[in-house]
């Protein structure tokens, strides 16, 4: 019978001296004086009758002693010896070590292969395995299988023969350094054994010892090493040692069970809670200072043999399978959701962390560990489906996430619409008073210009004079005196700061700074003044002898018999200057008539009507054809900006968003950040799906309106590409600090403005019209069915769109937050459109493409047909129509013409139908947006320690009153000195700028307070980069807040105007902890 098929015991041993030296003596035919001690062992299943049925569980009498028990010829021993002697048993002896090459990382390596046959040998083996008795080296020598043993060592011996030059010199090459291939082949075929090893050991003892010590690198491990690595309990010492060293396959090529590290194995055995008898050796873990005691302790343990030992292996394999199954369930959900859950990158990162947290938070882990704990002594462990970890996570989290993958379920489960119904009469009056006059945005025929357009400073003086004239007749102050931007960020319901404290903060900000202006003037900026004027009903005086105009709005416009509301525009002038306009009547035809299809193009457009609108590809190519026809017909478009506001008004115009009015047109600012250029056919196909997603969402959100996604219009405008080297002035990055700083001051002085439209200078589209016109003007659409073969769009990094969707009658929206939420819902609706993801998805860098920052009071958005202004005064990046014709469009030319109607691309246009507004959508509730952030916040509230309030943290430091004066005094006296010290250490030479600094309170909220630092010298310099040239000094702020660890912290941040510093983006420089004593420590 083949020896490899015999019953086998794998045995890990140790010696008191050097195990390598003693082993080499045995391998070379000598007898060592040092006995061998069994540390751990395992057996093949055909020896279960020996080790399981006669294990420690069958022993009923336990006699604790600190010496080995006398082994007598009792029934137990006779029974075991009978079972042993009925067969030959292979015993393979191991030492810690082995090769580490490729994917194989051995933990133990065999050194002896023995075959036990006689009763004397079995008796010695029985004493060693059952009671830890020393194993005499004579037994190893007598039972050693020479052939099998030296098969283990053949490679080592051959290598040693080569390295020690133990070869015939004729086999060497001429230089005596390299061995020929023929010699190596001869050497490999040569059988090596004890004779060769003995010769090597006799002549090269040092080299042989070194080689074997490198192979069996654990030869010097002490008993303490085993205790530290596998202890400290008896269960882990015995079971973990056996599993980790003898029962784990460490070859990654053949690995089926995941390879866990030692600590993980020890942790897994903690839930294997089978009752065990006391160790009959009488030793404790602390007594195991020698290998004889370690061997007695391990071999006498209940965990060494019997059902406890046999079931341990089955349990650990099932436990690993159960754990990995639950983990893989989460991975599978994430992998599947990765394909279908199209969300912005930040939300997807939150989703990944939340998915794991929902499965592996403390409660879930505790329940899982309880479910997989095994304490049955008799039955084989069965852990399959014992844990519901993945199921609970699915019910609590993944099902909710999956609801975001279906538009109907997404809106039904995540969106709550707060709608107020108006009566017919009230609705009619509400529509008239809260929308622009119809003629203001009507472009059917030429009309003269009636309005005012001038620089901000001029308009400010004009408004002040008008207020002085009308104030005796009841004209009230235009805007409440909150700090600029405070009304947009403060949550009054959550705020714990009193109104008196806010007024004190406002009063504290009236102190002039070095520029002559107050740090944060409480008077409203020009944008809010104009928005208030244009929307307010105001008063009217009929005493013409006293005043020339009846209302302040008439006085502002300089024309009688005009009524509001009126649109307010921002106009970007060359060199960064700004102008504003309030218009009662305009010559829109002079703007839009430039963008009409020529007569020849009209005939071609008529031919395009024959295309089947249900053919998605053909319809997309038809839309591309119409867009190209328009692009080739545009003429006489000025590319030179003007310094005269009224002239520049027809080159650059941005509508200011007015929260005092209702929204009748949904204007979306869309920016696709792309990986590579998109073919125009693909782009048109993707935008058809974009349109369908928006209108489908509106159909669900407005149940009492008639919305037909296949028929209702949706107007697209695409930004033309400027020259690659052009730098755009009105770079519309939204500032982080707009709501905490005096932005209006910078607007009026032309130093800063945030329009929040396109975020980069590399605007979009506009390919070479000379090339495309020749190729596509008379193209046969039916012959070009491959959208990927169309010409690519020339934009390299970003594609910008303005998408205008009329709110269906009889609905209207109110409020900035409502519109922001609505835009977020529509973005999710677009991402749920399969065609959009299929066509556009592969080209997108991320899935956050609708900018909601434009929907803030006083922010502006560039209108279609207008351009941006560059630093050189050039007008670039026009917003031109990008046609997406509805499937059921009856008159294509009428649809094309409607793109030029200003009533379709203003936020607050009056509905063109006679149906008054009856339903006002004023709030969107539910978890339609920021679901992951809200989930994180709830989990943090449940599992994190209670968060102390800012008020409590300040009271611990002696600040009992939360008013601006007290907070400023606290910062000036306690914090600024330490900030200066920190700057002196980390920013040498800059501390002089902060020596005469004082703080000004800007905003007080429930959980943070913001201050601006006022420099008493020439001003601050940027702490991030050493900018060249005379640049406006950056603004420096400090914020006071409590972090997640309940530490009161102060953060210093700067807002630098340099492009290298992201053009006014707020950047935190450092954060310090505020302890209960004056000196701060770095956080």
UniProtKB/Swiss-Prot annotation:
Its main location: host cell. GO terms for biological process: bidirectional double-stranded viral DNA replication; DNA replication. It comes from the Viruses. Keywords: DNA replication, Host nucleus, Metal-binding, Transferase, Zinc, Zinc-finger. A zinc finger (CHC2-type) spans 1022-1061. InterPro entries: HSV_PRIM. It is an enzyme of class 2 (transferase). GO terms for cellular component: host cell nucleus. The record marks 669, 671 as: Essential for primase activity. It is found in: Host nucleus. Pfam families: Herpes_UL52 (PF03121). Its EC number is 2.7.7.-. One of its GO terms (molecular function) is zinc ion binding. Disulfide bonds: none annotated. Essential component of the helicase/primase complex. Unwinds the DNA at the replication forks and generates single-stranded DNA for both leading and lagging strand synthesis. The primase initiates primer synthesis and thereby produces large amount of short RNA primers on the lagging strand that the polymerase elongates using dNTPs. Associates with the helicase and the primase-associated factor to form the helicase-primase factor. Belongs to the herpesviridae DNA primase family. HAMAP family: HSV_PRIM. This is DNA primase. It comes from Varicella-zoster virus (strain Oka vaccine) (HHV-3).
């Amino acid at each position: 019978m083949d020896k490899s098929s015999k019953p086998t015991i794998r045995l890990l041993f140790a010696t008191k001296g050097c195990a390598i030296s003693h082993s080499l003596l045995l391998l070379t035919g000598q007898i060592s004086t040092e006995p061998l001690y069994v540390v751990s062992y395992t057996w093949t299943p055909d020896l279960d009758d020996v080790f399981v049925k006669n294990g420690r569980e069958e022993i009923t009498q336990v006699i604790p002693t600190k010496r080995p028990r006398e082994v007598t010829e009792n029934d137990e021993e006779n029974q075991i010896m009978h079972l042993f002697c009925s067969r030959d048993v292979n015993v393979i002896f191991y030492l810690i070590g082995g090769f580490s090459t490729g994917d194989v990382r051995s933990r133990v390596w065999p050194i002896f292969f023995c075959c036990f046959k006689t009763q004397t040998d079995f008796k010695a083996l029985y004493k060693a395995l059952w009671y830890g008795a020393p194993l005499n080296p004579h037994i190893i020598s007598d039972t050693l299988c020479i052939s099998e043993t030296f098969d283990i060592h053949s490679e080592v011996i051959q290598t040693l023969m080569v390295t020690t030059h133990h070869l015939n010199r004729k086999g060497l090459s001429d230089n005596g350094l390299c061995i020929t291939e023929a010699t190596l082949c001869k050497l490999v075929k040569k059988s090596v054994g004890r004779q060769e090893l003995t010769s090597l050991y006799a002549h090269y003892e040092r080299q042989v010892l070194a080689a074997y010590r490198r192979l069996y690198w654990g030869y010097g491990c002490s008993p303490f090493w085993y205790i530290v690595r596998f202890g400290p309990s008896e269960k882990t010492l015995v079971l973990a040692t056996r599993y980790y060293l003898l029962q784990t396959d460490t070859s990654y090529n053949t690995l089926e069970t995941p390879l866990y590290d030692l600590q993980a194995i020890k942790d897994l055995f903690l839930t294997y809670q089978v009752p065990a008898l006391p160790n009959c050796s009488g030793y404790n873990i602390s007594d195991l200072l020698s290998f004889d005691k370690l061997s007695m302790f391990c071999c006498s343990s209940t965990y060494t043999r019997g059902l406890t030992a046999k079931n341990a292996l089955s349990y650990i394999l099932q436990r690993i399978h159960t754990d990995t199954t639950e983990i893989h369930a989460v991975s599978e959900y994430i992998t599947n959701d990765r394909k279908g859950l199209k969300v912005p990158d930040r939300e997807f990162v939150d989703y990944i962390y939340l998915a794991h947290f929902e499965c592996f938070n403390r409660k879930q882990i505790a329940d899982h560990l309880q479910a997989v704990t095994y304490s049955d002594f008799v039955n084989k462990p069965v852990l399959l489906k014992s844990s519901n970890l993945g199921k609970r996570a699915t019910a609590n989290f993944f099902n909710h996430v999956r609801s975001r993958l279906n538009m109907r379920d997404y809106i039904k489960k995540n969106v709550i619409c707060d709608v107020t119904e108006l009566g017919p009469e009230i609705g009619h009056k509400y529509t008239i008073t809260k929308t622009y006059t119809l003629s203001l945005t009507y472009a059917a025929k030429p009309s003269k210009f009636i309005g005012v357009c001038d620089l901000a400073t001029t308009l400010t003086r004009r408004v002040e004079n008008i207020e002085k004239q009308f104030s005796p007749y009841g004209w009230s102050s235009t805007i409440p005196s909150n700090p600029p931007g405070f009304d947009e960020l403060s949550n009054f319901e959550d705020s714990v700061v009193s109104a008196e404290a806010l007024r004190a903060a406002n009063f504290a900000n009236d102190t002039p700074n070095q520029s002559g202006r107050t740090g944060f003037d409480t008077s409203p900026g020009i944008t809010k003044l104009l928005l208030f004027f244009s929307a307010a009903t105001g008063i009217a005086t009929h005493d013409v002898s006293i005043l020339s105009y009846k209302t302040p709005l008439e006085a502002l416009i300089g024309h009688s018999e005009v009524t509001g509301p009126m649109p307010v525009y921002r106009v970007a002038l060359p060199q960064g200057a700004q102008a504003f306009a309030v218009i009662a009547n305009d010559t829109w035809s002079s703007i839009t008539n430039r963008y009409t299809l020529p007569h020849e193009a009209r005939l071609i457009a008529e031919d395009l009507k024959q295309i089947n609108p249900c053919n998605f590809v053909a319809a997309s190519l038809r839309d591309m054809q119409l867009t190209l026809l328009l692009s080739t017909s545009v003429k006489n478009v000025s590319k030179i900006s003007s310094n005269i506001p009224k002239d520049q008004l027809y080159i650059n115009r941005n509508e200011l968003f007015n929260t005092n009015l209702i929204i009748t047109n949904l204007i979306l600012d869309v920016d696709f950040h792309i990986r590579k250029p998109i073919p125009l056919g693909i782009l048109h196909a993707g935008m058809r799906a974009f349109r369908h997603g928006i209108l489908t969402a509106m159909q669900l959100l407005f149940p009492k309106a008639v919305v037909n996604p296949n028929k209702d219009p949706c107007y697209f405008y695409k930004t033309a590409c400027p020259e690659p080297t052009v730098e755009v002035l009105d770079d519309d990055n939204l500032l982080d600090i707009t709501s905490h700083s005096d932005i209006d001051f910078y607007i009026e002085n032309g130093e800063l403005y945030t329009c929040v439209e396109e975020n980069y200078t590399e605007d979009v589209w506009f390919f070479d019209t000379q090339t495309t016109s020749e190729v596509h003007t008379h193209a046969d659409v039916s012959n070009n069915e491959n959208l990927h073969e169309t010409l690519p769009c020339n934009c390299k990094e970003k594609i910008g769109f303005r998408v205008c969707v009329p709110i269906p009658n009889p609905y209207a929206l109110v409020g900035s937050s409502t519109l922001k939420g609505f835009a977020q819902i529509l973005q999710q609706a677009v991402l749920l459109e399969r065609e959009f993801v299929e066509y556009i998805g592969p080209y997108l860098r991320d899935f956050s493409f609708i900018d909601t920052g434009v929907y803030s009071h006083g922010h502006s958005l560039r209108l279609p047909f207008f351009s941006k202004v560059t630093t050189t005064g050039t007008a670039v990046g026009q917003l031109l129509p990008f046609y997406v014709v509805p499937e059921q469009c009856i008159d294509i030319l009428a649809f094309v013409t409607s793109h030029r109607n200003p009533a379709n691309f203003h936020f607050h246009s009056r509905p063109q139908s006679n149906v008054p507004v009856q339903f006002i959508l004023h709030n969107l509730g539910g978890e339609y947006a920021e679901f992951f952030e809200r989930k994180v916040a709830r989990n943090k509230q449940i599992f994190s320690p209670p968060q102390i309030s800012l008020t409590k943290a300040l009271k611990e430091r002696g600040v009992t009153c939360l008013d601006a004066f007290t907070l400023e005094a606290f910062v000036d006296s306690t914090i600024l000195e330490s900030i200066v010290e920190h700057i002196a250490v980390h920013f040498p030479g800059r501390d002089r700028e902060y020596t005469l600094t004082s703080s000004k309170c800007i905003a007080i909220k429930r959980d943070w307070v913001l201050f601006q630092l006022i420099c008493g010298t020439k001003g601050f310099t940027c702490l991030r980069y050493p900018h060249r040239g005379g640049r406006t000094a950056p603004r420096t702020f400090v914020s006071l807040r409590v972090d997640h660890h309940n530490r009161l912290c102060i953060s210093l941040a700067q807002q630098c105007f340099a492009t290298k510093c992201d053009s006014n983006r707020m950047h935190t420089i450092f954060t310090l902890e505020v302890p209960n004593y004056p000196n701060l420590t770095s956080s």
